[in-house]
UniProtKB/Swiss-Prot annotation:
Top-rank EC class of the record's enzyme: transferase
GO cellular component, one term: cytoskeleton
UniProt activity-regulation remark: Can bind 1 iron ion per dimer. Iron binding seems to decrease LDLR degradation activity.
Organism: Rattus norvegicus
Region spans: Critical for homodimerization: 431-433
Record pathway: Protein modification; protein ubiquitination
Zn finger limits (RING-type): 387-422
Protein name stated in the entry: E3 ubiquitin-protein ligase MYLIP
Region (Disordered) residue spans: 341-363
Annotated keywords: Cell membrane, Cytoplasm, Iron, Membrane, Metal-binding, Transferase, Ubl conjugation, Ubl conjugation pathway, Zinc, Zinc-finger
Tissue: Expressed in developing and adult brain, hippocampus, cerebellum, cerebral cortex, thalamus and substantia nigra. Predominantly found in neurons.
Main location: cytoplasm
Length: 445
C-alpha cells in the first residue's frame, strides 16, 4: 500500500507499507529515513471529507481511517511541541523549525513588530546565509507588512548583518527559541461553534485550553487542573469545568463532523497526558471501541479478542518519558558505534551503524562476533545501573514501602510517588548495591 507523505518543507516522500499496516508503521518508516529517533513528537495528518485536519491514529489501521483507496496522502507534522533545549537531535530540530516557519508565514503564530524584524533576519540567514543585498530583501517581507518602510527595512538589514557567520542550524535554533516564548507556541487550534452557534477557536496547549474569537482575540482560558472531564457525543464535545465558586459548569462545543469532534476530544486528553502527567495511564492507553463484527465476536467468543478493536488514543509516552527514551536510544547508538570503530578510523556520526568491522588484532584471541556480544552485555549492565530519571547517576536509593530500587538519591528525594508502581513514597532508604563504578568501567578487550 502506497502512502504519499508531505514534509513541512513541501518535499513529498513515497512510503510503501503493508495493506493492513497501522499508522505507526508509516511514521516509523518516515522518521527512519530522516534519521529521527524522537518519533513521539510527530504525527501524520490528513484532510477529512469536510476539509477538517485530522490526526491519523497511529495504533489503528491506515486503510480504516482514510477515505477512498490508496495511495493515501498524509502530512508529517509536529504533534507535541517542546522547548528547543529538550530536542536532542538536529534532524528533529530541523523539522520543528520547518513546521514553525510554515506556521509563521501562514499567520498562525502572532508576533510583535520587534519579533517580526528579528525573525525576518533569522529566516533570511537560514535561507540565504550571510547578508547579500541582491537576495536577502525578497524574504524580509514574509513576516512584516508587504510594503516595508525604510526604517523597518533598515532594522532587518542591521539584524541580518549582525548574524554574519551564523550557521543555518544555529539560526534555526534561535528561531525556535524566540517562537517558544510566544503565548501560542505548541497550541493546536480547532474551529467550533458554541451552544448559541457562535463561531469560535479552541486552542489546546501545554498549559490548558484557550477559547478565542475567529481573529484569535481571547475570550477565556481554562487551566487543566479545573477541567473535571471531557466527553464526546457525535459532533459535540462537552467540557466539565470547576468554577471559582466551586460549582461545575458544562461547556458545549459543536464541530463540523464526528471525526472533528473526536479530534478535539483526543487533543484534550493526549495533550494533558503528554505535558502534565508523569506517565500515560492504562485508562488512556487501553480505551478503545469496536465495530459491530468485533462486538459480536467479543460477546460470543472471547472478551479480549482484538477483532474490530479501534483504539481511541495513540499516545505512548509523556514529554518526560520521550526525553528519557531518546537519551537512552542515542546513548546506546553512540556506545555501539564506539565499540565497532577501529582506533585508526576517524570519528563518525553517533548514529552510525555498528556494521563496520573490527580488526582481529584488537580482539586478542576472541572472534569479532564474541567481542561485540561481550561489549553489548557490558553496555546493558552499565545502563541497568543508571538512575531511570536522570540517566546519569548510579542507583543507590530504595522507595519505601514498595521496595523498588531504580533511582539515585537526588532524584528519589524529589519524587512523591514511585515511577514504577505509582504507589506513594513514605520515605527513601539509601542502599549499597554490590557494584562499583570502577568494575563497570572495565573493558572486555
Amino acid at each position: 500500500m502506497l502512502c504519499y507523505v508531505t514534509r513541512p518543507d513541501a518535499v513529498l516522500m513515497e512510503v510503501e507499507v503493508e495493506a493492513k499496516a497501522n499508522g505507526e508503521d508509516c511514521l516509523n518508516q518516515v522518521c527512519r529515513r530522516l534519521g529521527i529517533i524522537e518519533v513521539d513528537y510527530f504525527g501524520l495528518q490528513f484532510t477529512g471529507s469536510k476539509g477538517e485536519s485530522l490526526w491519523l491514529n497511529l495504533r489503528n489501521r491506515i486503510s480504516q481511517q482514510m477515505d477512498g483507496l490508496a495511495p493515501y496522502r498524509l502530512k508529517l507534522r509536529v504533534k507535541f511541541f517542546v522547548e528547543p533545549h529538550l530536542i536532542l537531535q538536529e534532524q528533529t530540530r530541523h523539522i520543528f523549525f520547518l513546521h514553525i516557519k510554515e506556521s509563521l508565514l501562514a499567520g498562525h503564530l502572532q508576533c510583535s513588530p520587534e519579533q517580526a524584524v528579528e525573525l525576518s533576519a533569522l529566516l533570511a540567514q537560514t535561507k540565504f546565509g550571510d547578508y547579500n543585498q541582491n537576495t536577502a530583501q525578497y524574504s524580509y517581507e514574509d513576516l512584516c507588512e508587504k510594503e516595508l518602510s525604510s526604517s523597518t527595512l533598515n532594522s532587518i538589514v542591521g539584524k541580518h548583518k549582525e548574524l554574519e557567520g551564523i550557521s543555518q542550524a544555529s539560526a534555526e535554533y534561535q528561531v525556535l527559541q524566540i517562537v517558544s516564548a510566544m503565548e501560542n507556541y505548541g497550541i493546536e487550534w480547532h474551529a467550533v461553534r458554541d451552544s448559541e452557534g457562535q463561531k469560535l477557536l479552541i486552542g489546546v496547549g501545554p498549559e490548558g485550553i484557550s477559547i478565542c474569537k475567529e481573529d484569535f482575540s481571547p475570550i477565556n482560558r481554562i487551566a487543566y487542573p479545573v477541567v473535571q472531564m471531557a466527553t464526546q457525543s457525535g459532533k459535540n464535545v462537552y467540557l466539565t469545568v470547576t468554577k471559582e465558586s466551586g460549582n461545575s459548569i458544562v461547556l458545549l462545543f459543536k464541530m463540523i463532523s464526528t471525526r472533528a469532534a473526536s479530534g478535539l476530544y483526543r487533543a484534550i486528553t493526549e495533550t494533558h497526558a503528554f505535558y502534565r502527567c508523569d506517565t500515560v495511564t492504562s485508562a488512556v492507553m487501553m480505551q478503545y471501541s469496536r465495530d459491530l463484527k468485533g462486538h459480536l465476536a467479543s460477546l460470543f467468543l472471547n472478551e479480549n479478542i482484538n477483532l474490530g478493536k479501534k483504539y481511541v488514543f495513540d499516545i505512548k509516552r509523556t514529554s518526560k518519558e520521550v526525553y528519557d527514551h531518546a537519551r537512552r536510544a542515542l546513548y546506546n547508538a553512540g556506545v555501539v558505534d564506539l565499540v565497532s570503530r577501529n582506533d585508526q578510523s576517524p570519528p563518525s556520526s553517533p548514529l552510525k551503524s555498528s556494521d563496520s568491522s573490527m580488526s582481529c588484532s584488537s580482539c586478542e584471541g576472541l572472534s569479532c562476533q564474541q567481542t561485540r556480544v561481550l561489549q553489548e552485555k557490558l553496555r546493558k549492565l552499565k545502563e541497568a545501573m543508571l538512575c531511570m530519571v536522570c540517566c546519569e547517576e548510579e542507583i543507590n536509593s530504595t522507595f519505601c514501602p514498595c521496595g523498588h530500587t531504580v533511582c539515585c538519591e537526588s532524584c528519589a528525594a524529589q519524587l512523591q510517588s514511585c515511577p514504577v508502581c505509582r504507589s506513594r513514597v513514605e520515605h527513601v532508604q539509601h542502599v549499597y548495591l554490590p557494584t562499583h563504578t570502577s568494575l563497570l568501567n572495565l573493558t572486555v578487550i
